[in-house]
From Swiss-Prot:
Residues where L-tyrosine binds: Y31, Y162, Q166
Main location as per UniProt: cytoplasm
Binding site for ATP: K225
GO cellular component: cytosol
Name this protein carries in UniProt: Tyrosine--tRNA ligase
Record gene name: tyrS
Motif 'KMSKS' region mapped to chain: 222-226
Length: 412
């Protein structure tokens, strides 16, 4: 474990670890949990997936836990308000999807589901066998619990009890599977240490915990959220193109952190990128983005993302798929207009009307310079009108001003 901990420290992605963990020399197994709060994992989960894969390269046996049982309750960690409880059929569906996703990204890694050992457990048995080992004062002292109790929202007994469930997970895996290490994001430290204490109180042996920093920007906000929603790993929810564009648009200052947490590049490669970043941050950002997209969606996914990006350039719109148009709209680059009222209008009026140009004078100047495009064609003159033949997939049109400014018209 000493080599692994040093690797994490050198990389700058070690938040905390249990006393004595760095002295463990015998082979050890470790697990990391994923609660099925949605039907797909998101980019924040990719840190955990990379973490499990990184552990395997150091001879640590990784195990992924899908929390069907804990997902029925909801983890209050990092949440300022109560989670909306999911129905059992929704949790089951999400769990199946997450298991498939984890199997894809972690081939050969054992995946367990905590519903296996919680199913059939009665409330009386749980309170007698588990609850008896927890002290209210200690639980109230946990940061997550304190913050929620002091908030206007408060915390329900349901979420307050989550820490017992996660602790029982750890104890079960320790006793039945010999898993002595639990890993997670920094917001999981309180839950992890509670599990370690529970294992000790049960007299089962010595367990350990290790956490990594959460993926946040310079303002402390989680990376992986956009105005239109979460960045998912499922390509049907977040396309490779959208993922590619998301990372390309991140501030340059976020690149070193992204490279460390979301890639499996070696520390030596990371340090080399740090040096190059000082002179050419854009090239490093592009390389890191390509590395992440390839890891998640494969070479084909990267090629598609690059193809769509290129096809957005003037003259190449014919290769854009319907999903690509939808992605642009979901990224806030779209506007809906009434089909009947829009068709037949002059383009110069439409460009000004949707706010793409500030005035007709600006629009005329850009048209004369061949700088305004409708799909793959520059607007011929200021008298050109919107024709039915210009509509793609019966509802989309791509407006462009040069190479960077783009807007999708969605006809309804």
């Amino acid at each position: 474990m000493r080599d692994f901990i040093k690797h994490l420290k050198d990389r700058g992605i070690l938040e905390d670890f249990s006393h004595g963990l760095d002295s463990v020399e015998s082979p050890i197994s470790a697990y990391l949990g994923f609660d099925p709060t949605a039907a797909s994992l998101h980019i924040g989960h990719w840190i955990g997936i990379c973490f499990l894969r990184r552990m395997a390269s150091f001879g640590i046996t990784p195990v992924a836990l899908v929390g069907s049982a804990t997902g029925m309750i909801g983890d209050p960690s990092g949440k300022s308000i109560e989670r909306t409880l999911l129905e059992s059929n929704e949790v089951a569906h999400n769990s199946k999807k997450l298991s498939e996703c984890l199997s894809h990204y972690l081939p050969g890694v054992q995946i367990v589901n905590n519903m296996e050992w919680f199913q059939g457990t009665t409330v009386i048995d749980f309170l007698r066998d588990v609850g008896k080992h927890f002290r209210l004062g200690t639980m109230l002292g946990k940061d997550t619990i304190k913050q929620r109790i002091q908030s206007e929202e408060g915390i329900s007994y349901t979420e307050f009890s989550y820490i017992l469930l996660q602790s029982y997970d750890f104890a079960h895996l320790f006793e039945k599977h010999g898993i002595a290490l639990q890993c997670g994001g920094s917001d999981q430290w309180g839950n992890i240490t509670s599990g370690i204490d529970y294992i000790r109180r049960k007299g089962l042996g010595q367990a350990y915990g290790l956490t990594y920093p959460l993926l946040t920007n310079s303002q402390g906000k989680k990376i992986g959220k956009t105005e239109s929603g979460t960045i998912w790993l499922d390509p049907t929810l977040t396309s490779p193109y959208e993922l590619y564009q998301y990372f390309l648009r991140l501030p340059d200052a976020e690149v070193p952190k992204i490279a460390r947490t979301l890639t499996l590049l070696s520390n030596e490669e990371i340090f080399d990128l740090d040096k190059k970043f000082l002179s050419d941050p854009i090239a490093v950002k592009k390389f890191v983005t390509e590395t992440i997209v390839t890891s998640i969606h494969g070479e084909d996914g990267l090629k598609k993302a690059q193809m769509v990006t290129q096809s957005m350039h003037p003259g190449k719109v014919s290769s854009i798929s319907e999903k690509d148009f939808q992605d642009l709209i979901s990224m806030g680059q779209g506007i809906s207009l009434d089909r009947v009222q829009t068709l037949g209008k002059r383009w110069i009026d439409l460009f000004v009307g949707v706010g793409f140009c500030n005035s007709k004078g600006e629009a005329r100047r850009l048209i004369e310079q061949k700088g305004l495009y409708v799909n793959s064609e520059p607007i011929a003159d200021e008298h050109s009108v919107f024709e039915e033949r210009q509509v793609c997939y019966d509802q989309y049109v791509l407006l462009a001003q040069g190479k960077k400014k783009k807007l999708v018209l969605h006809l309804i």
